[in-house]
Amino acid sequence: MGVIEIHRILDEVRLLGCSDLHFTDRIAPVVRLNGTLRTMRSQYPEMDEEEILDIIHQMTNDAQQTSINNHHDTDFSFQTRSGYRHRVNVYFQKGKPAIAIRLLRNDIPTLEDLGLPPILADFAMRPRGLVLVTGPTGSGKSTTLAGMIDFVNLNRSAHVITVEDPIEYVHEHKRCMVNQREIGDDVPDFALALRAALREDPDVILVGEMRDFETIQAAVTAAETGHLVMSTLHTTSAADTINRIIDVYPEHQQQQIRTQLANNLVGVISQTLIPKKDGTGRIACMEILNVTDAISAMIRDNKIHLIQSAIQTGKQQGMMSLDQELARLTAKNIIGEVDAIEKCQDKQEYYRFLSQFGGTPTGGMNISQG
């Protein structure tokens, strides 16, 4: 086959509304559309190693090619001639190169555009503390954080420092001065960037991902010393998120980190993407924890198991459980019951909330009205 021109195929799949593009050996290019993988075999034949290497060379500079050769796993950002940005991961499988490309929006979506709850704006405007957006890969965490940073940029005079691997959304200076640092090009790793940030007079620090103990420790310290820190984890609930952070600490330091989280954690947004029933894309579905005094006491006293029930009864404080939100969206006919059940944490709770929202289950579940 002829050489694939990366600029052209990326523009092509963007027009189709795809979120991801994959190249791997012995299969045609593969896209992800509305969460589902589809091959482009009708437009392109199978790829081979030489063609994939050619695509890599089209996207990389000498330093990136050296990193790929040395590590066999490299992240970087790539901009097409049409001006659109992409997050690229080059990796090896069975000794051969493969590429995963995430298509990014050029415009930074507002919290309103994303249909996100007002409490996220409240979290974004806090003068200090730790805000975490969590969820599996591809759940829209970076987009939610971009919307929150943009809200800060429009509504507050502040110095914002982001540390990302790679930079996904490019923020202009609006009311804020925004400096964005990319791992590899600007700084070696997240932990070092966080420690350096404390000497750079920031008000708000965005950490793309809290990957290890050193980064978590540095993020908590930054929040504790008077900065608003936003970051992500790959956890699926608020309680899991808190436990994950505590568990990375040695046992003799765990009471200390409980106290630090109790004093500094502002909120946890755990999200997943669900296909819309009308087939027009996916919608973010969230569990939201607002760390009130009562929640702080639960964290400090190691009663994390009580947090889930506190979320369910915390509507007045802007909280909601994932099952509540899934039930609400099902009752409004925005998502389907089968998709909701696949993502829910507790099927009985989901159906109980569905009944409260006036929804009618189709799965044959007998709902108690008591």
Regions found by a protein language model. Give the residues of each.
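Short, flexible helix-loop junctions that flank or precede catalytic/ligand sites
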Residues: 1-370
